[in-house]
Amino acid sequence: SCNTEVKEANYQIIPLPQEISVMDQAAPFILSNGTKIMYPEGNEKMQRNAEFLASYIKDLTGKSLAVQAGTDGKGIILQLGGNAKNPEGYQLKVTSDQVVISGPTEAGVFYGIQTLRKSIPVAQGVDIALPAVEINDYPRFSYRGAHLDVSRHFFPVDSVKRFIDMLALHNMNRFHWHLTDDQGWRIEIKGLPELTEVGSKR
């Protein structure tokens, strides 16, 4: 990048990871336009994770990062494995050459992505310095969710999608969608059209 301005990432996020070890003396990883996001070849869920991360980074920084199969080389690497014992746990390790997010499952890697996402500042047109760090994290509770009642009030589709995205950002893994109640029936069932033809207007 020709731009000399650099913004620094901040790992003090919500929820705070279980273990954060910042290497103050080590060189940071510089997130720039040339950074690549890599994932295990042939794994569609990990490819989707990589594409999610690329989308998040574009929203935050304006950078369009290349997504490619393979887990060798410099860049952001998503991989299965690591030492997390919880299936939704993950490890995030940053060196000057790589950002490696690993977990025993694709879900664990996804939550590692959320931690990276929250650490990156909203900064268009500048490079981002990610301090060298090792983060080990896992959820304390297997059920982490929130409830949204759409039976009593109308919600735009985009609002519901935004709500789900905020759940993911905060490492929630359950979306309790309250679709029906006395006030109305909100979910369309093709074989039972009267549920929405009549029930949605109550």
Q: Residue ranges of each PLM-predicted region?
A:
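The substrate-binding groove and active-site-proximal loops of carbohydrate-active enzymes
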Residues: 102-103, 144-157, 198
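Aromatic- and acidic-residue-enriched carbohydrate-binding clefts of CAZyme catalytic domains
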Residues: 183-202
